[in-house]
Amino acid sequence: MSSQPAGNQTSPGATEDYSYGSWYIDEPQGGEELQPEGEVPSCHTSIPPGLYHACLASLSILVLLLLAMLVRRRQLWPDCVRGRPGLPSPVDFLAGDRPRAVPAAVFMVLLSSLCLLLPDEDALPFLTLASAPSQDGKTEAPRGAWKILGLFYYAALYYPLAACATAGHTAAHLLGSTLSWAHLGVQVWQRAECPQVPKIYKYYSLLASLPLLLGLGFLSLWYPVQLVRSFSRRTGAGSKGLQSSYSEEYLRNLLCRKKLGSSYHTSKHGFLSWARVCLRHCIYTPQPGFHLPLKLVLSATLTGTAIYQVALLLLVGVVPTIQKVRAGVTTDVSYLLAGFGIVLSEDKQEVVELVKHHLWALEVCYISALVLSCLLTFLVLMRSLVTHRTNLRALHRGAALDLSPLHRSPHPSRQAIFCWMSFSAYQTAFICLGLLVQQIIFFLGTTALAFLVLMPVLHGRNLLLFRSLESSWPFWLTLALAVILQNMAAHWVFLETHDGHPQLTNRRVLYAATFLLFPLNVLVGAMVATWRVLLSALYNAIHLGQMDLSLLPPRAATLDPGYYTYRNFLKIEVSQSHPAMTAFCSLLLQAQSLLPRTMAAPQDSLRPGEEDEGMQLLQTKDSMAKGARPGASRGRARWGLAYTLLHNPTLQVFRKTALLGANGAQP
């Protein structure tokens, strides 16, 4: 009995070699965890993101305070000599000649930051510095209401970056250069240290931040260029000297417009000319003498950024998963399919190849649907820009808005101001939702086409659609014959032409055929109703992001919130920034500056050296002014003619009642 336990005993030196932990050779040593294959480990930058954002937020507040010292509000504080500090405006939305690239870049940066915020756990990154770690050692990220505060945080973070461009001061350009380079340096440093992240896709954060880096890179170059120009005296006295340049160009182009009708009609009509006309009506091309408002430029920029961000999210969120599933298919999939009663083949290896091929086809259908959705959305955007220009030109000429009679007043209203404020945001949201709906519809359509028609025809198996058509061909043939025979009878039997006018004939046969074919027409009507639902769904999905088009009937067009917002947006734009009205105000200021005065010129008037430049507003190439006063008189005389001919919507209340009825509805 003593020999048995003695046989199980081992020497002390052999105890470590046959320990319990050494039996599992796949276990990591030292308590380390195995990293799953293909999974990206979490990356942490050398400096916490919270510290980055804390420094950027402090710098932004400092820049905003300095800008407030530069921008003096004399109108609000007339008793103060130099004025009181005021909050600078980030963007002058209703100005016609302010730089448009800077607001577009800032809005692109803001939207890209919001897109990166959605999958991020840290809604307010700098709060993680003060957050207490949880029991497992990880810092608890703020969620819930902090996400809402994060939306306001990023808007306030980039507020000074946009306000530096509207201040019109050399110090503002210096502050903008510093702030833009700080933002760009932080973003580049973070992407360089952690190019791969485990969220959604390893390169999603890097790809989604490309518009962000592009916008910050542009701002980091634009502000230094403006700073150098201000030091070299290449710019004028700021934005005040540029306020009437677009209005002057618009009015000059309107009054000096040449007759192009003869050359247009004498041109040869062919395929190239027809294609050119179609492209002109479908794709926006700039035209001299007309600029789109800044709000529309921002909407186009935000729409392009939204298309990129949504398409990227749809691509990296689905395609890598399909590829992983296709790479992990083994022979066990045959047993899984057999459990559902699906037997593709007796050979298991052939089943694996078939499943991989079907997954590859599914991936192709998904990518094709995504490409088609992006192309259609982009074409709808370009078509909308053409419609915007057409509507604005018609409203500048005095056309009436096709809203209800209660909303046709030219004066701004509470609803109109709210719609104007939310127009660009609505446009971005509509484009995002429209692209998502189009992706779902096109993916289902391409998948059905591939798996029910193309692949069965190519491989000669799984002919489910063709077998169903084979079994139900009498039904479809009856419906087709009913439709064909009714159309033939309507053309040859029930319609007769007398003296060039078609008339009904054989009415008894017509009544009998209508009664007898009623059951078949009910079935045909069911098919037509299904087709109508599919067609209307496809049409509305494609035009969901087009706010200038109502998705409801004309009588209920005002119930469409997107269309209603667009029409009120046009009302504010035309009533507050009409180029002809701006040119008229510029002429009044220029004429006032020419009058002999003993007191100094006010701040809002032009300088004495700029009156000659303003007199060139309405002068043609043939007549040039020799002096300032004759030019001013001719300018005022020609403005009287232009003012008489132009119908300014802001002055509708001063028109005659007969002229109000002459304005046609806006198409």
From Swiss-Prot:
Carbohydrate-modified residues: 8
Positions of the UniProt region annotated as Interaction with RBP1: 235-293
Comp. bias regions, Polar residues: 1-13
Tissue spec. comment: Broad expression. In adult eye expressed in sclera, retina, retinal pigment epithelium, and trabecular meshwork but not in choroid and iris.
Membrane topology value: Multi-pass membrane protein
Primary localization class, coarse: membrane
Cellular-component GO terms for this entry: plasma membrane; protein-containing complex
GO biological process: adrenal gland development; alveolar primary septum development; artery morphogenesis; blood vessel development; camera-type eye development; cognition; developmental growth; diaphragm development
UniProt region (Disordered), positions on chain: 1-20
Keywords, alphabetical: Cell membrane, Disease variant, Glycoprotein, Membrane, Microphthalmia, Phosphoprotein, Receptor, Retinol-binding, Transmembrane, Transmembrane helix, Transport, Vitamin A
Signal sequence annotation: none
Residues annotated with Phosphotyrosine modification: 643
Effect of residue 644 to M: In MCOPS9; loss of tyrosine phosphorylation
Entry's induction text: Up-regulated in the colorectal cancer cell line WiDr by the administration of retinoic acid and in tumors with frequent defects in Wnt-1 signaling.
Record's comment on post-translational modification: Phosphorylated on tyrosine residues in response to RBP4 binding. Phosphorylation requires the presence of LRAT, suggesting it may be triggered by the uptake of retinol that is then metabolized within the cell to retinoids that function as signaling molecules.
Intramembrane-annotated stretches: 510-547
Cited Pfam families: RBP_receptor
Subunit: Homodimer. Interacts with JAK2 and STAT5. Interacts (via extracellular domains) with RBP4. Interacts (via cytoplasmic domains) with RBP1.
Domain note: Contrary to predictions, contains nine transmembrane helices, with an extracellular N-terminus and a cytoplasmic C-terminus. Besides, contains one long helix that dips into the membrane and then runs more or less parallel to the membrane surface.
Function: Functions as a retinol transporter. Accepts all-trans retinol from the extracellular retinol-binding protein RBP4, facilitates retinol transport across the cell membrane, and then transfers retinol to the cytoplasmic retinol-binding protein RBP1. Retinol uptake is enhanced by LRAT, an enzyme that converts retinol to all-trans retinyl esters, the storage forms of vitamin A.
Disease: Microphthalmia, syndromic, 9: A rare clinical entity including as main characteristics anophthalmia or severe microphthalmia, and pulmonary hypoplasia or aplasia. Microphthalmia is a disorder of eye formation, ranging from small size of a single eye to complete bilateral absence of ocular tissues (anophthalmia). In many cases, microphthalmia/anophthalmia occurs in association with syndromes that include non-ocular abnormalities. Mutations in STRA6 may be a cause of isolated colobomatous microphthalmia, a disorder of the eye characterized by an abnormally small ocular globe.
This protein's name: Receptor for retinol uptake STRA6
UniProt source species: Homo sapiens
Gene field: STRA6
